[in-house]
Each structure stands twice: as structure tokens, then as C-alpha cells.
Amino acid sequence: MKDKIKTKILSPFLYFLKSESSSGIILLICAIAAIMIANSSFSGGYEHIFHTNITIGYGVFSLSMSVLHWINDGLMAIFFLVVGMEIKREVVFGELKSFKRTILPISAAIGGMIVPAIIYALFNYKEPTITGWGIPMATDIAFALGMLSLVAKNAPKGIVVFLTALAIVDDLGAIIVIAIFYNSQISWIALLLGLIVFATLILANKFKIKYTSIYIILGIILWICLLKSGIHATIAGVLLGMSLPIGENIHKFKTSILYKLEHILTPWSSFVIMPIFAFANAGIIINTDNFSGSLFSPASLGIIFGLFVGKQIGIFGTSFILIKLKIAKFPSNVTKRHLYGASVFGGIGFTMSIFVSSLSFADANILSEAKMCIMIASILAATYGTIVFKFINFKNEKLNYKQS
């Protein structure tokens, strides 16, 4: 009986993990393809496609945005819906339920957000690019887990759970930062209507309404309200995910709306939405004439050092201090080397950092420069993280050989 309950708890987590990690390879392919096309004779067509306006609806009941905005505001809301459902499930039934089990990844995630932001701010103090302080705070869960699964196949499950929980908390932190700091002028009427819709979602859950269509319709209305309010529309996805019925206990979880939607949307989010987002946003035009100069601008240095150095200091430093003070303890079979390797992979910002950069900078040149540095920092983190885990594998193999 206990094994069945354990399987029910872990199966969605493992399903999510498998989808996120394997989609990292597809994300990488899409990003490389976007860069190659943006720097080829097809660049004009690439730009034209994503800046073409598409109108949905009719008259006053219509929305008109570029393809890029439909991707960043529309499709990404579905990605954040999956994140919202994942957060709720982990808080209610999973790895974020117990305070003792969550203090380490939560604190590490907070440290991994604060330190990179401070490093960026130090480089950009009194500069107009200070608005990009949120860029190095983000971790790309798909790439981070993808790299871990590729280079550390024999890593203890504890470090996988740690990095996953850390990335989830990191996503939640990014959502809060976007909601509070990266918004245009607020329309209070639209925001009030959005809050009323969200309250309706909460009441629907409380009164145990089990019609999925009602939640989806209310979620779309909430998305429109937030889009019109100036609050970034992707927040609607998180709010919808957090308000979906999850079941009173683990036995009823698999019949809940949240479980069903999560299993339907997770593969679409991992293998369709995120690759499209990567392809649409990673098309950086590399100007070799000004390449070295742009690398040493305050924004570039802030992003590279924030992601590559700041994440390591923030995640590993916070974890090490908490463990030394005996406030937290190592996950099962996890060593400080594993924690350090995971903290390095935390510096893979990629899609999430690119997303925040698109909200931070209106200037196309600065935005292109920021995206390029995000790619550089993410590649550095992925490469160095691989070296760290290869070293751990070598040490373990050497130890096993001596023992045999």
C-alpha cells in the first residue's frame, strides 16, 4: 500500500523531470538554429515572421500582437501554467511539503537569486542598464536538468531532487520579480477585474467545481485582464495553476483537474512551447566588429559574472552555511561536490534569462548584447558543470576500484 502511494506521489514528478531534461537537447538545437538563421541570408525572413501582426477576435473583442508577442505573452502563459501546477503539487504532496526537506533548496534558490542580482547591480550602478538586474537571477530548468541527466547519469537521486526543487523555487522567484518590477503602466480597472476573476477561480475550487472547461475559460479571461492591466500576462498561467483543484488527499490526486491538465500540457510545454520560444528569441545577430567591446559593457559583465559566478556563490555558499550551522543537512547520498556541481548548472539561465531580458531592455542593440551574454554565460556554466561532474565520476570510479 505504501509503495502504491509513493508511486502516485513520485510518478508525476518523474514524468515532469523526464520531459524537462530531455527537452533541453531540443532547446539547444532550436537556439543554435535561430542563431545560424539570424546570421545568414535568411535573417530578413526570420525577422519578418516574428514581427508580423496577428489579430484574434473581431472589433472591440479582438487582440492584435506580433507573432513574437503572442509567443512571449501567450504560449509562455501555458509554460507558466505548468510551472504553477508543478509548484502546487510539490507544496501539497511532494518535495516542498516538509519544511525540513525544503529549507535547503529554498534557501539555496533565494541565495542563487540575490547574489547574481547584487553582482549585476554592482557592474551597472548608475547605468541605464540597471533595469536588467533580474536577468542573472533566472535558471533554465530544462537545460539544467538536461545537463545533469546527460553528464551525471549515476548521480544520487537526492541531487536531482535538490536541483529540481531549487529550479522550481527559482521559477517562482522569477515570476514574483516579473510581476512586481517588470511591468508597464498599470491599468487598475483591468487589474481589479483580473483579481475578481482570480477570486472566482479560488471559489470554484473551494466549492469543488470539477468542470475543467470552467477553469480554462476563467483562465483565458484572467490572461486578457492581466494583458490589458500592464501586469505581465504570463502571471495568469501561474495563478490558474495554483488555483486548480488537486484533490483532498493523495488517493484522489490522480482524478483531479490539476493532474489531468499537467499530464496533458507538460509534454506540449517541454517539446513545443519552449523550443518555439527558444527559436523565436535566441536569434542573435553576432557583430564581430563590435564583439569584444560589447563583451566588456556593464550589462554584459553583470550578466556573465552574475550567472556564472553569482549562481555558484549564491547556491553553494548558502547551502554550505546552512549545513555547517546544522539548520539543514545533505540530501541522501549527496556530497558537497554534488552540491557544487548543481550550483554551477544553476548558472544556465538561457530561456528564462532571455525572457527577463526581453522585459528589461527596449533598445534592440542592448537586448541583442544581453542575449549573447546569456548564451555565453550559460555555455560556460554547462561546460564547467560537466567538468565538475566528470571529476566526481572519476573520483567515484577510482574509489570503487580501490575497494574492489
From Swiss-Prot:
Disulfide bonds: none
Main subcellular location: membrane
Keyword Acetylation: no
Origin superkingdom: Bacteria
Keyword annotations: Antiport, Cell membrane, Ion transport, Membrane, Sodium, Sodium transport, Transmembrane, Transmembrane helix, Transport
Ranges that cross the membrane: 24-44, 67-87, 103-123, 132-152, 161-181, 184-204, 216-236, 266-286, 303-323, 339-359, 372-392
Record-linked InterPro entries: Na/H_antiporter_dom_sf (IPR023171), NhaA (IPR004670)
Reaction(s) catalysed by this chain's protein: Na(+)(in) + 2 H(+)(out) = Na(+)(out) + 2 H(+)(in)
Single annotated GO MF: sodium:proton antiporter activity
Topology within the bilayer: Multi-pass membrane protein
GO cellular component, one term: plasma membrane
Cell compartment(s), UniProt: Cell membrane
GO biological process, one term: regulation of pH
Pfam families for the chain: Na_H_antiport_1 (PF06965)
The family this protein is said to belong to: Belongs to the NhaA Na(+)/H(+) (TC 2.A.33) antiporter family.
Biological role: Na(+)/H(+) antiporter that extrudes sodium in exchange for external protons.
PANTHER family in UniProt: NA(+)_H(+) ANTIPORTER NHAA (PTHR30341:SF0), SODIUM ION/PROTON ANTIPORTER NHAA-RELATED (PTHR30341)
Protein name: Na(+)/H(+) antiporter NhaA 2
Organism: Clostridium beijerinckii (strain ATCC 51743 / NCIMB 8052) (Clostridium acetobutylicum)
Gene name of the record: nhaA2
